[in-house]
Amino acid sequence: MKAAEWSKVVWLEIGDENPVRLRISNSRQAAECLLERWPRKNNRAYKHAVMGCSRALKGLISDEIARIFLMEAAKQANYAFTVTKNENSVSKLEAEIA
């Protein structure tokens, strides 16, 4: 199943010594980042973000809520991030027409 693109992209810098800049634009990418690349996995916001991405991928919550969980985890881990409009996202109306 393909994850829906978020309306906004999260540009995230993770890591302490040599931070890596990542472009995350959907819940699947966020889950992969959290599970495979996230150095600090021992706080509540991280766990909420993992669960949020999982629930979004199952269709239980919106993908936009998963994005918010990711940003909260980044804040708690003191990782820099910026948010920009996702030029690749498709509105619900456009998706229904297609």
Predicted features and spans:
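Weak global preference for isoleucine
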Residues: 14, 24, 61, 65-68, ...
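The feature represents the first ordered module of a protein
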Residues: 1-51
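Short, compact, well-ordered microdomains
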Residues: 54-91
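General "foldedness" signal
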Residues: 24-26, 48, 67, 84, ...
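Short, functional C-terminal segments
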Residues: 1-7, 83-98
